Design a protein with these regions (language model features):
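Iron-sulfur cluster-binding electron-transfer modules in prokaryotic oxidoreductases
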Residues: 3-12, 22-25, 77-309
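Ferredoxin-like iron-sulfur electron-transfer modules
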Residues: 11-33, 44-62, 75, 82-85, ...
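Short glycine-/small-residue-rich flexible loop motifs, especially phosphate/cofactor-binding loops
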Residues: 28, 38, 57, 67, ...
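C-type cytochrome heme c attachment motif
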Residues: 33-40, 61-69
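Generic secondary-structure signature for well-ordered alpha-helical cores
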Residues: 36-46, 123, 210, 214
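Short metal-binding segments enriched for Cys and/or His
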Residues: 69-76
Length: 309
């Protein structure tokens, strides 16, 4: 089965409002108790059971690192997917685009440019700039089009009556959208771990890349098997360990050019010596900025922006 195929994945259980919609990994009977997963886990979510290692689902941050280090493939993600609202069901009178705090920091002009594209199709869509960690203050039944995987997860689960769909599913559905021609460009794709359980997002992104004549060389850990770039380790382990994990992830990607759709991943790939290509930049035929912020600088700026929005 392809890592971006959803034909054999099971829809996840209904979301419980107020509880962040997180998934986890588990250890199968193939475990040989080597302990590699426990050493790599940034949050100490894995412990030795009676016959094999076990994952505490409440502690697990769903980064996927255990799956990348397990020599037997015994550490696996839960086999569930989370559906998006059908684009055909979008109510334009209650439709919003949230660019996410990180995009707004990275290139403040991008949200308005993307809004222009969306307004050509959805005339009544509104820009929504409230951080996903705060009450969105929009009507029950509204839908937020999200760029950020974390925003998608939090908006759909922490707040009553909010539907979500990724920007990439929506943009891919715009049949008359003119896209730049990037013929000759070969890339790997680093899929955001927050979208791991949405293969429809992975499919939309590959479709957009194909429309731009970009060749994709997939890595073993992509799509529903993608693992965190390492940035989510920040705050759990020393920065040196975060940077080690970032380098580990970069090595897994066959191409030096890496398509990403998360700003934290842009910074991570720059640090690891890859050339990140931020998907909004590709679609708009713009150059991706090679972010030089340290881990602390990036997270300080992001934290301040979150507090203010």
């Amino acid at each position: 089965m392809s890592n971006i195929d959803n034909n054999r994945l099971t829809p996840a259980k209904q979301i419980h409002c107020g509880i962040e919609d997180k998934f986890s990994y588990h250890i199968t009977a193939d475990c040989i108790s080597c302990g590699a997963c426990t050493k790599a886990c940034p949050v100490n979510a894995i412990s030795k059971g009676e016959n094999q290692y076990m994952v505490n689902a409440e502690t697990c941050i769903d980064c996927g690192t255990c799956s990348a280090v397990c020599p037997k493939g015994a550490a696996v993600r839960v086999p569930f997917i989370r559906q998006s609202i059908d684009i055909k069901e979008l109510d334009e009178e209650h439709l919003y685009f949230n660019p996410g705090c990180a995009m707004s920091l990275y290139k403040p002009e991008l949200p308005s440019i993307i809004m222009g594209i969306l307004k050509d199709r959805f005339e009544s869509i509104q820009l929504h700039s409230v951080c996903c960690r705060h009450d969105p203050k929009i009507p029950h039944g509204s839908t937020i089009i999200n760029n950020c995987a974390g925003c998608d997860r939090r908006f759909r689960s922490l707040y009553e009556g909010i539907n979500t769909v990724s920007l990439w599913e929506v943009v891919d559905s715009l049949s008359d959208l003119e896209l730049p021609d990037h013929t000759g460009l070969t890339v790997s794709v680093h899929d955001s771990c927050g979208y791991r359980h949405k293969p429809q997002v992975h499919q939309a992104i590959r479709s957009l890349l194909a429309k731009m004549n970009i060749k994709v060389v997939e890595s073993k850990f992509s799509g529903t098997e993608s693992v965190c770039c390492g940035d989510n380790f920040y705050g759990y382990v020393p920065n040196a360990d975060v940077e080690k994990r970032i380098r580990m992830r970069a090595v897994q990607l066959p191409s030096d050019n890496v398509v990403v759709y998360c700003i934290g991943c842009v910074r991570a790939m720059v640090f690891a010596g890859k050339t990140p290509l931020y998907l909004p930049d590709l679609i708009l035929d713009k150059k991706t900025e090679m972010m030089q912020d340290t881990l602390d600088e990036y997270h300080l700026k992001l934290g301040q922006y979150i507090d203010e929005h």
